[in-house]
């Protein structure tokens, strides 16, 4: 019997693409790179912040006939992205229609609800508190403890901490 449900955040619970795109574009343009489009941002997200920035810089460099991404460029874009995304993560994000009602219904049916995201953990928690306060049993984002999906550390952690029956945990390494 299913007792717990794990959700992604971006593109599943919330529409956050505009805030992500605007933040990355401010970092890119400030460092002499070209902007990415919404469609490109959608294509580049999903594997964590490092991949998003690396793909965005490489795309800009392809236009200038080189796709080499230097660590110094990555660090400069990252610094601006992190600052801007703190401003945009709430103001430029929308909860998908009926999501809160659906989650509340699942909660009332006895499911444990979790978020496991490749977004930085420092962004996940404020977003969950703002959009879905009190709904999720735990929300985790990218961190040294969890890593990024498809790494199974996040699922292992949630299973070991929140599923009380030891027999349900046997297959987890």
What are these regions (language model features)?
Residues 19, 48-51, 122-123:
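Short alpha-helical
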Residues 161-173:
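Single conserved hydrophobic/aromatic residue that forms the stacking wall/gate
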Residues 7-9, 81, 155, 162:
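Conserved hydrophobic/aromatic "anchor" residues
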Residues 29-35, 61-70, 108-109, 132-135:
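Short helix-capping segments at alpha-helix termini
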Residues 91-94, 120-164:
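Substrate-recognition "cap/lid" segment bordering the active-site pocket of phosphatases
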């Amino acid at each position: 019997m299913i007792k717990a449900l794990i959700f992604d955040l971006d593109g599943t619970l919330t529409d956050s693409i505009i805030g992500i795109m605007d933040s990355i574009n401010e970092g890119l343009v400030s460092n002499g790179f070209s902007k990415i489009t919404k469609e490109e941002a959608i294509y580049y997200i999903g594997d964590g912040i490092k991949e998003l920035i690396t793909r965005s810089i490489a795309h800009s460099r392809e236009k200038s006939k080189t796709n080499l991404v230097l660590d110094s460029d990555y660090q400069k874009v990252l610094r601006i992205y992190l600052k801007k995304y703190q401003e945009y993560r709430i103001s430029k994000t929308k909860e998908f229609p009926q999501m809160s009602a659906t989650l509340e219904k699942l909660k009332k049916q006895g499911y444990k609800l979790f978020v496991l995201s490749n977004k930085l953990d420092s962004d996940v928690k404020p977003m969950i508190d703002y959009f879905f306060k009190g709904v999720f049993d735990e929300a985790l984002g990218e961190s040294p403890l969890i890593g990024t999906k498809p790494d199974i550390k996040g699922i292992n952690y949630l299973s070991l901490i929140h599923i009380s029956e030891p027999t349900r945990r046997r297959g987890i390494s």
